[in-house]
């Protein structure tokens, strides 16, 4: 029925493309007229568009003419004409949608269309890439077109001087990575001077590789942190504990005897759990190494931190492995991006995990950090007035884009039909059999002159395969995080006849593999050679292309680029990205995945079913199973994982939305403080409110005089705010004084003392001092609030045991924490300003300089893993325990939460 309806009225995608094609026809009709313009007339079009837009013409109405101008500029600057399908993609991007275009269809050039159109508004357009290399490359490459049309471009990269960053954001078009845009937003909300802020209002962003940034990295927030207290010795001593504990052969099953051992590992949830025997063993070991006093229990509230450190050490030993999740370089543990295989230099895991891995590897342990500011990409990118994205693989995640970002995915047709052959997976019983089949396939391609790209899921696997190829005497190149610097060079050679390239996940590589090899670098070198005349350059380039042509034909005859996958990834999208490297622009190509029942995805999610099929077929050793049914079975397993990951991201967003609402309120108030000419009226309001609250603590409203604690109020005013006021004497002299009149006198006294301070220092200097104190107080209490939210988040799932909704409880308690924080900011600001003794304007300036100095010390930037514990409401986790003070509970006693379970099977499991 659904398919019949689609045939009759077309799918939503078909209807959108039909609408867009009308606009493309309009753009094409303008081409002769625009082509007739001189370079100067084409440049003048930009100012004409700006004037028309200011006079009320919408960007939508300017689209046909603006796109036609960009197409003409592309022809004149690059000698490249935007295809009609690129126009379709450009219209989709302008309309705030995700354009899915196959690899090699020209996404970078397509983006120039909506970027130019939206830059006409003069509010700044951000083009977001996955790494600094692509940001610089695209800014330089596409910048030539924008400059030709009178638009300015900038690029933001890490460690860039602040004045350069400010200039880059002031440009019409700004290129940069998702991390840098996010960090700059956080930095702007930590600045103490308006002129030091970098970003303008977030107007329009185009996100390249949108699936990688908005989905793969959505669980990992950007964090700016500073150093916390030192636990170095504890990490080193705790590192000796995991090897002394015994791992269970399997996870305990209900109603079955518990397997022998101290702990089990849940690879699905990436957590480690202790058995009852394990807790006893751990206590004995910790006592023996001097970490736990004799006769005391790990369950004592004062040893909860010890428990946390032990569980972190166990995770470091059982779930995090060298050359898979991280590498060791220059005496440092460097995280490897699970999705792209890139080294994530400078990023650190949170909750002490990074320090535990450093202790395991015997490298220098760096200090733990306190979060200063944090935001997820989900919440950062949703702040843009308009957001769009482009990728080669978005359709599998279209539902998530729509659900979380309200971004619709439009599948753009290819310029030429795709002829790549995607063969069924081959599944072997063992890894050894799988690698033998891969070697045979690679050898066959190499002998026939067909280039091969082999995709692996980890650095370890890529180096294992490289070792096998060396033994087989097959020449090859390895492209992984360790070869990052040579990446573009390796990719340029990957399409040459018989070339073998091994690569970790190719997501976000950003460089096309051209059949016969790429000559772009040599062409660029010829263009840059000033010793050659233009005519000589043209001759050399023609010769170069003539030499490349037979190589290109030879590779096409051999079957184009061969893609070999050594494992299925959790996400079908990552597999599709690997396949998408072949078959660009109508080129031939083929792909196949080789799997074994020992692969992680197969073992955890699909192994039993496929193994049963293999046993029924009684396949001999080395013989694979290859059938559409098996491929579908694997894709079903991948869908399950994708569904679970989507649920986790959605849960995370629901929790983070609470923090995000608070962040927006606080940052808005902070910006008001920063931008206001004077905050004197604000401070006065805070002071009067603080005085009234203190006053009512001793003299409640509508109370009789016998209930008043006047002596206590006098003491509090003198101790907290240095207000010496003889309230007792006043009441004796004027017995008819009401509480309201008494409050007015206290408020007036506070105002008088404050006015004297202002007059002594000077109104201008004091106003600056007020601002500085207010900003410091906001920042300090916000940091503490972020830590409090973190602790709350880690333990909130326990409320599920008490038949409460953890999300509702989190919202309620987070609101209470936020209200309490605002009160503490108020009290802190009033206390400092009332008690500080300032004699001159010079002292004020020195205090501000000291604050600014403290403000920038030991700041680090992370994109660390969010703890998944909060995403699985009510499910037991091995996360950091809740820090509260509880009476000691025996493991076999009933749990104090009231669930009726034994403590060891309930909250004891989470300790």
Swiss-Prot record:
Biological process (GO) annotations? intracellular protein transmembrane transport; protein import; protein targeting; protein transport by the Sec complex
Relay the cofactor remark from the entry. Answer: May bind 1 zinc ion per subunit.
UniProt record similarity statement: Belongs to the SecA family.
Q: Which NCBIfam families match?
A: PRK12904.1, secA
Classification of source organism: Bacteria, Pseudomonadati, Pseudomonadota, Betaproteobacteria, Burkholderiales
Taking the first listed entry, what is the main subcellular location of this protein, grouped into a coarse class? Answer: membrane
Q: Which cofactor does it need?
A: Zn(2+)
Residues the record lists as binding ATP: 86, 104-108, 512
The chemistry this enzyme catalyses reads:
ATP + H2O + cellular proteinSide 1 = ADP + phosphate + cellular proteinSide 2
Q: Which positions are annotated as binding Zn(2+)?
A: 895, 897, 906-907
- Keywords for the protein's UniProt record, in alphabetical order: ATP-binding, Cell inner membrane, Cell membrane, Cytoplasm, Membrane, Metal-binding, Nucleotide-binding, Protein transport, Translocase, Translocation, Transport, Zinc
Q: What protein does this entry describe? A: Protein translocase subunit SecA
Molecular-function annotations in GO: ATP binding; metal ion binding; protein-exporting ATPase activity
GO CC list: cell envelope Sec protein transport complex; cytosol; plasma membrane
The record's listing under Pfam families reads:
P-loop_SecA, SEC-C, SecA_DEAD, SecA_PP_bind, SecA_SW
């Amino acid at each position: 029925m659904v398919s019949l309806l689609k045939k009759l009225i077309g799918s939503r995608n078909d209807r959108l493309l039909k609408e867009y094609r009308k606009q493309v026809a309009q753009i094409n009709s303008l081409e002769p007229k625009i082509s007739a313009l001189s370079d100067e007339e084409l440049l003048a079009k930009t100012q004409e568009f700006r004037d028309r837009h200011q006079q009320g013409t919408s960007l939508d109405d300017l689209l046909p003419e603006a796109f036609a101008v960009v197409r003409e500029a592309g022809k004149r600057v690059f000698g490249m004409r935007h295809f009609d399908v690129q126009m379709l993609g450009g219209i989709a991007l302008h309309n705030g949608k995700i354009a899915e275009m196959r690899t090699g269809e020209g996404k970078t050039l397509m983006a120039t269309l909506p970027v130019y159109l939206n830059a006409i508004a003069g509010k700044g357009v951000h083009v977001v890439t996955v790494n600094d290399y692509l940001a610089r490359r695209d800014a330089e490459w596409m910048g030539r077109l924008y400059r030709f049309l009178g638009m300015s471009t900038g690029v933001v990269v890490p460690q860039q001087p602040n004045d350069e960053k400010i200039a880059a954001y002031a440009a019409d078009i700004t290129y940069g990575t998702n991390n840098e845009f996010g960090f700059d937003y956080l930095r702007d909300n930590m600045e103490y001077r308006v002129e030091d802020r970098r970003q303008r209002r977030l107007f329009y962003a185009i996100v390249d590789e949108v699936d990688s940034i908005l989905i793969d990295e959505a669980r990992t927030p950007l964090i700016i942190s500073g150093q916390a207290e030192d636990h170095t010795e504890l990490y080193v001593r705790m590192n000796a504990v995991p090897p002394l504990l015994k791992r269970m052969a399997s996870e305990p099953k209900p109603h079955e005897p518990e397997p022998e051992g101290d702990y089990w590992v849940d690879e699905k949830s990436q957590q480690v759990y202790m058995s009852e025997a394990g807790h006893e063993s751990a206590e004995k070991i910790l006592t023996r190494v001097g970490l736990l006093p004799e006769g005391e229990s790990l369950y004592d509230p004062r040893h909860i931190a010890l428990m946390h450190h032990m569980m972190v050490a166990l995770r470091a030993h059982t779930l995090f492995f060298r050359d898979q999740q991280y590498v060791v370089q220059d005496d440092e543990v460097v995280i490897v991006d699970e999705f792209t295989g890139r080294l994530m230099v400078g990023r650190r895991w949170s909750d002490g995990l990074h320090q535990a891995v450093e202790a395991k590897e015997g490298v220098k342990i760096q200090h733990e950090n306190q979060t200063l500011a944090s935001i997820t990409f989900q919440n950062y990118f949703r702040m843009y007035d308009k957001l769009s994205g482009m990728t080669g693989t978005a359709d599998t995640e279209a539902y998530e884009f729509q659900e979380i970002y309200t971004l619709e995915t439009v599948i753009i047709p290819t310029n030429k039909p795709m002829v790549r052959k995607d063969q069924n997976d081959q599944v072997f019983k063992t890894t050894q059999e799988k690698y033998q089949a891969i070697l045979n396939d690679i050898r066959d391609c190499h002998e026939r002159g067909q280039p091969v790209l082999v995709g692996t899921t980890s650095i370890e696997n890529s180096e294992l395969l490289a070792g096998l190829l060396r033994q087989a005497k097959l020449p090859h190149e390895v492209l992984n995080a360790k070869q990052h610097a040579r990446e573009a060079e390796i990719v340029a050679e990957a399409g040459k006849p018989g070339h073998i390239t091994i690569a970790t996940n190719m997501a976000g590589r950003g460089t096309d593999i051209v059949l016969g090899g790429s000559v772009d670098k040599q062409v660029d070198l010829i263009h840059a050679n000033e010793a050659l005349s233009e005519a000589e350059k043209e001759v050399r380039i023609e010769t170069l292309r003539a030499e490349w042509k037979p190589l290109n034909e030879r590779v096409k005859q051999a079957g184009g680029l061969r893609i070999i996958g050594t494992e299925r990834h959790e996400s079908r999208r990552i597999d599709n990205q690997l396949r998408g490297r072949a078959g660009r622009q109508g080129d031939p190509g083929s792909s196949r995945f080789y799997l074994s029942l020992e692969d992680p995805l197969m073992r955890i999610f699909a192994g039993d079913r496929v193994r049963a099929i293999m046993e029924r077929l009684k396949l001999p050793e080395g013989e694979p199973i290859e059938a559409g049914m098996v491929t579908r079975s694997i894709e079903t397993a991948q869908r399950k994982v994708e569904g679970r990951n989507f649920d986790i991201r959605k849960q995370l967003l629901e929790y983070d939305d609470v923090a995000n609402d608070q962040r927006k309120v606080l940052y808005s108030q902070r910006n008001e403080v920063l931008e206001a000419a004077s905050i004197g009226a604000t401070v006065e309001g805070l002071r009067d409110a603080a005085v009234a609250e203190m006053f009512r603590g001793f003299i409640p409203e509508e109370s009789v005089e016998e209930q008043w604690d006047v002596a206590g109020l006098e003491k509090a005013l003198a101790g907290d705010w240095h207000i010496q006021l003889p309230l007792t004497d006043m009441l004796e002299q004027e017995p008819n004084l009401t509480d309201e009149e008494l409050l007015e006198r206290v408020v007036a006294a506070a105002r008088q003392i404050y006015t004297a301070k202002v007059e002594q220092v000077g109104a201008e200097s004091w106003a600056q001092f007020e601002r500085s104190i207010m900003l410091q107080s906001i920042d300090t209490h916000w940091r503490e609030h972020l830590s409090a939210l973190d602790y709350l988040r880690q333990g909130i799932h326990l409320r599920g045991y008490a038949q409460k909704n953890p999300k509702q409880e989190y919202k309620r308690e987070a609101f209470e924490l936020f209200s309490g924080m605002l009160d503490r900011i108020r009290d802190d600001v009033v206390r400092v300003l009332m008690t500080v003794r300032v004699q001159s304007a010079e002292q004020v300036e020195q205090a501000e300089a000291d604050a600014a100095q403290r403000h920038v010390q030991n700041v680090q930037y992370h994109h660390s893993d969010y703890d998944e514990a909060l995403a699985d409401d009510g499910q037991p986790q091995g996360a950091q325990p809740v820090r509260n003070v509880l009476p000691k509970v025996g493991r076999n006693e009933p749990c104090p939460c009231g669930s009726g379970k034994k403590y060891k099977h309930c909250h004891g499991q989470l300790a």
